[in-house]
Amino acid sequence: MAGAASRRSTLTLYSLCNCCHCHRVRLVLLEKGLDPEFIWVNPASPPPDLLEASPGGHLPTLVDRDVVLYNDRVIIEYLDERYPHPPMLATDPAGRARQRLALARIEQDLYAQLPRLSRSVREERELAREALRSQLVAGAAVFAARPYFLGTDYSLIDATLAPLLWRLAHYGIELPPEAAPVLEYAARMFARPAFRQSLSAVEQEMRDDGPAARPPSSETVR
């Protein structure tokens, strides 16, 4: 795709500053050790180069030289194939399929609740909180089984779960004692340098333990 955005020589991500979908892409970029340019977008006034690259103004949008992608799931799988070290999906087909199924379940069962948490109707927000709370409690044993979710190595699943878990307190979701493995897992994910660097200024303020850290990448506000 021609145009100013696709002619960029750097890896560029157009991102919202408070979006879980955008956050997981930022996290994958940094876990890969890449040096992207983050362009923080005001959705009420998207920059012309974003609209040129992605006429719908989709966020997140990734520009990697002449490749322009949107849809966070598509982007993170592209990044794992385009920049294979460290690998963030299993090397065997069966392992990759299991991880993709897990990603689909997380998106369907957990990420799908996020829009409801911002609704104006209190009952709707509480239903979403309870849905997230109950599903995380039900999966506590899986979080306890291995150092990372479903494996011994950091994967796209971990990069998908961590941004969601970071937002629990912000949305008023408290987990009960039986979900301690979830909180222990979350603490390990939050301690990773790439996670600390992936946080926007807005996301840092979502929790009391938000760091005053900045990504090792250039940032532009549009």
Where are these regions (language model features)?
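GST-like domain detector, emphasizing the conserved glutathione-binding G-site
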Residues: 1-136, 140, 216
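Residue-level detector of family-conserved "landmark" positions at structurally sensitive sites
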Residues: 39, 72, 178, 199-200
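Conserved beta-strand edge residues that scaffold enzyme active sites
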Residues: 43-44, 182, 203
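Intrinsically disordered, low-complexity segments enriched in proline/serine/threonine
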Residues: 62, 165, 178, 217-218
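Conserved residues at the C-terminal ends of beta-strands
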Residues: 65, 162, 201
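Short, flexible loop/turn segments with low-complexity composition
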Residues: 91-92, 197-205
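GST-like fold's C-terminal all-alpha helical module
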Residues: 102, 106-198
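Acidic/histidine-enriched, glycine/proline-rich intrinsically disordered or flexible terminal extensions
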Residues: 202-222
